[in-house]
Amino acid sequence: MGTITVKDGTEIFYKDWGKGPAIVFHHGWPLSADDWDSQLLYFLSQGFRVVAYDRRGHGRSSPSFTHNDMDTYADDCAALVKHLGLKGAIHVGHSTGGGEVTRFVAKHGGNGVVSKAVLMNAIPPVMVKSDKNPGGLPIEVFNGMRASFIRSRGQFYRDIASGPFYGFNRPGAKVMQGIVDDWWRQSMMGDAKAQYDCIKTFSETDFTEDLKKIQVPVLVMHGEDDQIVPVADSAPLAAKLLKNATLKIYPGFPHGMFATHPEVINADLLAFFKS
């Protein structure tokens, strides 16, 4: 574990465990590298070097009052990759982290820097509804998120974690309280301004051109019952824009499926990594 200081003075916290082929994990909003701990330990046991970091303004990284945008997120990742000397790494992104991976690979992933990528329940091509994206979520959804965030960030985060994020609001679902508590813990570690800004970033950034630029193999994974990033307007569209994509939809799985169904997701990730 350590930190690096990027060009604007922001400190980025990271974990770097093991030796072997490198996997870099990118977390979702508003979480931290800790969200990947189960995967880090699993793939460490499989002989991989595993890296995960806290996005600026999230987790243990510095508060970030400005530059909470996807280009800067990608540049921060590039600085970390350079610092750690990573070549031919696999980049795995969940949700907003999937957008980060998309922008990073398109912008910085050439010359063998990246060998493969995974977009898991990821936000690309673009979340918000528009004339170009009629199947997207209305801007009122994200305005509502901002209003709830301002009213009580802590309560808003509890409601997300105990409800739609893991599908615990579905009839008959068994709530895993430890997962809910850990989601809230991670989220409240972050900087409120940076997390608030990120709502606009994850909802309005258009990754269409980024997806078209990516040359490496990409596994696009998505839970069919994702209530955060609806599958119909995300994974299938992203896969069509990618040059070398494998699309896998998981019936009944929620947004946070790598936590609720780790055995299934880890096995499919491992098969892709070794293919």
Predicted regions and their residues:
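Conserved alpha/beta-hydrolase "nucleophile elbow" surrounding the catalytic nucleophile
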Residues: 27-29, 89, 93-95
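Conserved acidic catalytic loop of the alpha/beta-hydrolase fold
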Residues: 72-89
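Conserved alpha/beta-hydrolase "acid-adjacent" motif
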Residues: 227-233
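Conserved HGGG/HGGXW glycine-rich cap/lid loop of the alpha/beta-hydrolase fold
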Residues: 10-63
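Flexible "cap/lid" loop of the alpha/beta hydrolase fold
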Residues: 102-151
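Short beta-strand/loop motif that positions the catalytic acidic residue
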Residues: 214, 220-222, 226
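Catalytic active-site module of serine/aspartate enzymes centered on a nucleophile-bearing elbow/loop
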Residues: 244-275
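Conserved alpha/beta-hydrolase catalytic His-Asp/Glu region
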Residues: 125-128, 132-137, 147-212
